[in-house]
Amino acid sequence: MWKNKDIYFFLKKKALLFQRKNKAKTYFILDEDELNRGIFNILGYFALSTKVLHLPEELSKNQRKKIDGLYKSVSEISTFLIGQIAKNDYNKSKITGDEILKYACYYILQASSIIGGRIVLVELVNNSKLIDFYNKNDFILLPNKTENEEKLL
């Protein structure tokens, strides 16, 4: 189902542990047509959590205020973290990445309406295809000194 070893490892070793310890919640998107026939078929999944984002020093005061919504001098901010998001390799044509991201954002909006919060964070490896995907979905790349990992809001 999951060709990517990192995805498989997360689902097999971490998802349930994070769920039990209330560190993150993992949501599976199921094929409703097959579920109605008694077949449990996962189309994709996403994991949500919270994380404190330490803002890069390079950000201007205006950029900081835009992110925080109130203050120019903020150095960190609480965020909703989309920690994992993936499609089942055997059902790629049944759901798009955009659809999975919309499901994740729906749950984040529900949480935000209850407890507040305004920033959604995605951490990912420096991969132009992934960065383009999130940019297309209105995420903004933060400047980052680390070459291997990028942060998008």
Regions from the PLM with identified roles:
Residues 1-93, 106-121, 125, 129-153:
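Non-catalytic substrate-recognition and accessory regions of acyl/acetyltransferase enzymes
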Residues 93-99:
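Glycine-rich phosphate-binding loop
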